[in-house]
Design a protein with these regions (language model features):
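Polybasic, glycine- and aromatic-enriched phosphate-binding surface used to engage nucleic acids
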Residues: 1-166
């Protein structure tokens, strides 16, 4: 306290952990894969978001995106589907994503922390924070490594997210 104000005094305790997928090999994709899926399937483009890890965050600098997240939170399928079979709806509406994720079905089904279906992410009360202006900082760093994101960048559990409240 002699050297400054604790960060918690400036944030209204709105400090959150980044996203835990439970299966990064399935849900975290390369820019090339993201571009191919988005080009073939424009409806799926909204489900592919920039994704950073703690080591990506630099002091005052957010580098070009090297990874993307397939972002389907818990409840995504049930809020949209018209068919009784969730996977059938998913495969019909997002065939390229369904094809990609189907390779990981066995592992994804075993995740304890997942959404309503194996292709959905775990529940989280603060997913909306990722769409707003926020500060991203790595959980482990030497010195201050933080960056202001104007909105839209998602981060893994090796990052903390400070909600700006805007």
């Amino acid at each position: 306290r002699e050297r400054g104000v604790p960060l918690s005094c400036c944030t209204d305790n709105k400090i959150y952990r980044g996203i835990l997928t439970g299966l990064n090999e399935a849900f975290v994709i390369s820019p090339e894969t993201a571009e191919a899926i988005s080009a073939e399937e424009p409806a799926s483009a909204e489900l592919i978001v920039p994704f950073y890890s703690g080591r990506d965050i630099k002091r005052y600098y957010l580098p070009p995106v090297k990874k993307y997240l397939i972002f389907m939170p818990k409840g995504y399928t049930d809020r949209r589907r018209e068919l009784s079979d969730g996977y059938l709806w998913f495969a019909q509406n997002h065939p390229r994503l369904a094809s990609h994720l189907a390779r990981y079905e066995a592992k994804a089904s075993k995740r304890r922390d997942r959404g309503d279906y194996w292709w959905e992410l775990r529940p989280c009360r603060y997913y909306d924070v990722f769409q707003r202006q926020k500060i991203l900082l790595p959980v482990i760093c030497r010195g201050i490594s933080a960056v202001l994101d104007e909105g839209g960048a998602y981060a893994n559990d090796k990052c903390c997210i400070i909600d700006s409240g805007d």
